[in-house]
């Protein structure tokens, strides 16, 4: 679907009155009972959907941040396709109710305190930050209660008053005649938009909405042991509520960047290290990379290719219990030489002859690394 602002032909900072005027004009133009073009009905539905989203501060805030994906089929959004023909035509021309009333009547908006929406923030962190945790500063766009009017939406010194059109109930009834008979339709009050109150003198700072969109700096604590997909909840840092309602929460979804040498399997760290055939045969002590930095690892004499050695307590801290840590498992890659010097070849041939002289029944290295070095079969 096209951008909602483009559908209504308004700018992204358009106020409520501008949106309403644009919607009424386009609803008259594309109403399927008037406009018989094949695409008129679909366009009429799109216009209605755009107005429903942008006329509500909460859904407008989500749309501005995340687009159509941020709406997620929000419950309570009326389906413009359910609008009745002649009744809607009456509303469109006389009251501007189009898109608000379904075939069974309008659903009133909640007039009391309304909790703000929860927000999502995606954050990428380094491998080491996921292991040991860190405090990070982020900037989030969200709705805050207008500090000029304290969320009332009214200019300082004034306040909301009971809507004279609906008497404060948020709904109006209209009787009309059609070729099919007379009927009464209940619809959202066009004057107060279902709230039961009107603001004659709106706050200039928030255009009467009671909330303003701002970018806020937050410092969040990333605990040790998090992983990709971990969700952190920051209470009260979502969008501000309406009419004194509580704010929603902020949910931070983490993605952990890969490490050039280390991999993760739960709380176990996996890595590989290359050793020479002489180190594998004779044993050695080498330096390996761990999340704690370089650490000494003992290569036992006679280590076979693809052997796995373990460094205890060098893995990932357990989320919620950072004292408990996993292990690091290191796969050993034994590198055999492609080319040998004459001296090396002579020594190896001498060693191979020494082992052959002992006889196969006494040969303890007739498989694995020695077999590969001396061309023997196990």
Curated annotation (Swiss-Prot):
An annotated Gene Ontology molecular function: unfolded protein binding
Binding-site residues for Zn(2+) 1, renumbered to this chain: 146, 149, 203, 206
Xref: InterPro entries: DnaJ, DnaJ_C, DnaJ_domain, DnaJ_domain_CS, HSP40/DnaJ_pept-bd, HSP_DnaJ_Cys-rich_dom, HSP_DnaJ_Cys-rich_dom_sf, J_dom_sf
Cofactor note: Binds 2 Zn(2+) ions per monomer.
CXXCXGXG motif repeats: 146-153, 163-170, 189-196, 203-210
GO BP of this protein: chaperone cofactor-dependent protein refolding; DNA replication; protein refolding; response to heat
Cofactor: Zn(2+)
Quaternary structure (record): Homodimer.
Pfam (any one): DnaJ_CXXCXGXG
Domains as described in the record: The J domain is necessary and sufficient to stimulate DnaK ATPase activity. Zinc center 1 plays an important role in the autonomous, DnaK-independent chaperone activity of DnaJ. Zinc center 2 is essential for interaction with DnaK and for DnaJ activity.
Residue intervals of every CR-type zinc finger in the record: 133-215
Protein name: Chaperone protein DnaJ
Location(s), subcellular: Cytoplasm
Subcellular location, principal: cytoplasm
Keywords in alphabetical order: Chaperone, Cytoplasm, DNA replication, Metal-binding, Repeat, Stress response, Zinc, Zinc-finger
Function recorded in the entry: Participates actively in the response to hyperosmotic and heat shock by preventing the aggregation of stress-denatured proteins and by disaggregating proteins, also in an autonomous, DnaK-independent fashion. Unfolded proteins bind initially to DnaJ; upon interaction with the DnaJ-bound protein, DnaK hydrolyzes its bound ATP, resulting in the formation of a stable complex. GrpE releases ADP from DnaK; ATP binding to DnaK triggers the release of the substrate protein, thus completing the reaction cycle.
Residue numbers binding Zn(2+) 2: 163, 166, 189, 192
This protein's GO CC annotations: cytoplasm
Highest taxon of source: Bacteria
Family: Belongs to the DnaJ family.
Originating gene: dnaJ
Transmembrane stretches, start-end: none
J domain boundaries: 3-67
HAMAP family to which the protein is assigned, alphabetical: DnaJ
């Amino acid at each position: 679907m096209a951008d909602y602002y483009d559908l209504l032909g308004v700018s992204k900072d358009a106020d409520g009155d501008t949106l309403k005027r644009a919607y009424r004009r386009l609803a008259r133009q594309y109403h399927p009972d008037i406009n018989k073009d094949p695409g008129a009905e679909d366009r009429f539905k799109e216009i209605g959907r755009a107005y429903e989203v942008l006329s509500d501060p909460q859904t407008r805030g989500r749309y501005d941040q995340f687009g159509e994906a941020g709406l997620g089929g929000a419950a309570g959004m009326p389906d413009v396709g359910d609008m009745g023909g002649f009744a809607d035509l009456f509303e469109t021309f006389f009251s501007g109710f189009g898109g608000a009333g379904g075939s069974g009547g309008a659903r009133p908006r909640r007039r009391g305190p309304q909790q703000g929406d929860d927000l999502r923030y995606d954050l990428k962190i380094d491998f080491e930050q996921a292991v040991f945790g860190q405090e990070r500063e982020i900037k989030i766009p969200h709705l805050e209660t207008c500090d000029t009017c304290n969320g009332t939406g009214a200019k300082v010194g004034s306040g909301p008053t009971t809507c004279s059109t609906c008497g404060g109930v948020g709904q109006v009834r209209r009787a009309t005649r059609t070729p099919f008979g007379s009927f009464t339709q209940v619809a959202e009050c066009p004057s107060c938009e279902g709230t039961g109150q009107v603001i004659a003198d709106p706050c200039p700072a928030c255009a009467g909405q009671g909330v303003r969109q701002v970018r806020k700096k937050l410092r969040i604590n990333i605990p040790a042991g998090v992983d990709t997909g971990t969700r952190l909840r920051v209470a009260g840092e979502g969008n501000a509520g309406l009419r004194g309602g509580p704010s929603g929460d902020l949910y931070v979804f983490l993605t952990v960047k890969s490490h050039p040498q280390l991999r993760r399997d739960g709380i176990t760290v996996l890595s590989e290290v290359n050793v020479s055939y002489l180190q594998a045969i004779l044993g050695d002590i080498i330096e390996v990379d761990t999340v704690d930095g370089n650490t000494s690892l003992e290569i036992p004499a006679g280590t076979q290719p693809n052997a796995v050695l373990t460094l205890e307590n060098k893995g990932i801290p357990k989320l919620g219990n950072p004292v408990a840590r996993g292990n690091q498992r290191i796969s050993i890659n034994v590198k055999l030489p492609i080319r040998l010097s004459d001296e090396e070849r002579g020594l190896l041939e001498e060693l191979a002859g020494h082992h052959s002289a002992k006889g196969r029944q006494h040969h303890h290295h007739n498989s694995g690394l020695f077999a590969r070095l001396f061309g023997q079969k196990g």
